[in-house]
């Protein structure tokens, strides 16, 4: 496989950007080697600058649920751009997308559009603090909620790959208001509330963790977190930046029957354009400026092109589309498990809907500690063998892979065939 142009571009990029990239996980630090520079994408495939074609399971880290360059999404964006790329004023497209969100998630009684998932989560935290008059928040070890200072404590995603439990630059006075507990461990959370319950403004969680790889909630865990929040007067914030509109038309909240106080969105809601949102209970959201005193603002919030892209993509995500995703994702997970068994490589394939991770572990993976115990060297060998055989996976053991409605049975078959070779390569690594 030729990679000369990617290598040359990476050399130039290292002179221009920290680590040669504009988001850490793209640098391949978790797997080694040269990141591929992508020239174009269509459907379920991406093509790098050297002309190598890959079945894409990164999908821009989740947003491209209908695939790359879907004609209806492209048409919607082009039509919006003809009318103006940004107004800095309200537009009808904001209403269209918001109404569709509330139609599918009635518990989002009011919402605010922003420009990223990080902006959504940091805003939700501010709102929770302002609404409750409390300062502390609780997050779970390994859950990533964006790059905001209060949330870079025991975070997953790129922080996990780099082995940084916290980030320099986050003041101790900020970090001390972020309390943590292990994911899937209700008794541990109960102890946190027993110690600090009166000062806790909110608990924020990924309902299905995607940023330590996919961690599946144990039965009763999510509702248990909600019940503890209600008991102690804290808000229950569900971070659906990754899971929203991906796991079902109602996201993870719809899938698991949750009714959060606040919920955050990103990724799918913008179909590849920069969009985030937060929303929830009417009485809470009515405290947000200009209706209330809790300030939040953004120059590009509700950008008309982004609103058009999100609306077009969500309209395409019918119940039939979700059924197709489930069938394809189950086939891929089963195929990967079988290929690993053939190679006698112990793995755990964790999956919920169209999110999955192959963990190189003998034991079940259900929290940050069990994820960190995985064999990342084997994952690196597996990743590079898959890349050589035309399957583009997340370049980290601690990230989720995604499928789109553009993926086909042939894509899955090609990927499973590549995995047979890749697991054999991984088996050679101690």
UniProtKB/Swiss-Prot annotation:
Q: Does the keyword Isomerase apply?
A: yes
Q: Which cofactor does it need?
A: pyridoxal 5'-phosphate
Associated pathway? Porphyrin-containing compound metabolism; protoporphyrin-IX biosynthesis; 5-aminolevulinate from L-glutamyl-tRNA(Glu): step 2/2
User: PTM N6-(pyridoxal phosphate)lysine: at which residues?
Assistant: 267
Q: Name one GO molecular function term.
A: pyridoxal phosphate binding
- Among its keywords, does the record have Isomerase? yes
- Give the Enzyme Commission number: 5.4.3.8
Reactions catalysed: (S)-4-amino-5-oxopentanoate = 5-aminolevulinate
Annotated compartments: Cytoplasm
Record-linked InterPro entries: 4pyrrol_synth_GluAld_NH2Trfase, Aminotrans_3, Aminotrans_3_PPA_site, PyrdxlP-dep_Trfase, PyrdxlP-dep_Trfase_major, PyrdxlP-dep_Trfase_small
**What does UniProt give as GO cellular component?**
cytoplasm
Q: Which UniProt keywords apply?
A: Cytoplasm, Isomerase, Porphyrin biosynthesis, Pyridoxal phosphate
- Which GO BP terms apply? protoporphyrinogen IX biosynthetic process
> What family is this?
Belongs to the class-III pyridoxal-phosphate-dependent aminotransferase family. HemL subfamily.
HAMAP family attached here?
HemL_aminotrans_3
**What is the name of this protein?**
Glutamate-1-semialdehyde 2,1-aminomutase
